[in-house]
């Protein structure tokens, strides 16, 4: 075996949301659903273009972002509370300490899954372990299920493309080779099947339109 086989993921239960990791310096997508779709589709294209077994974490396919916790009491994660206390002991004030844990807490990815616009995202009629994200009604699964142009359907389309017989030898099993002439803000690589067939993937991670110099015949 000349190549390994990995578990490919951007998010899991011990990580904050990928939107907030990879687009921290970009325009905030919280109130701009079109921008959130563009950012989410970029991450989805990157994820689905890599070699290995792809894992999509709950809420990732909806474009979930980090939550907004207003006090340390709203958190459940013990490590988050410990980090908060450590920040206070280091001399940071309460607002600064809360900002630190807001950015990195594991509870960001452990909030209830937003199924519907109903209370608690339709997850439970009882008291959930954590509150729902503030924007759950705007991105809930039911709403995206009904919108063929949603991020949820974009993920589904990418999965179909990846599994399609015409693409699977490249997109699932093919070699990954970096495209050298891409701009710094663009992640570009090609997937190469054993028979030489290639699929190029270009992902713009900036907040501006970029022009790609794609070689003839690529």
Residues covered by each model-derived region:
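Active-site and adjacent substrate-binding regions of carbohydrate-active enzymes
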Residues: 1-218
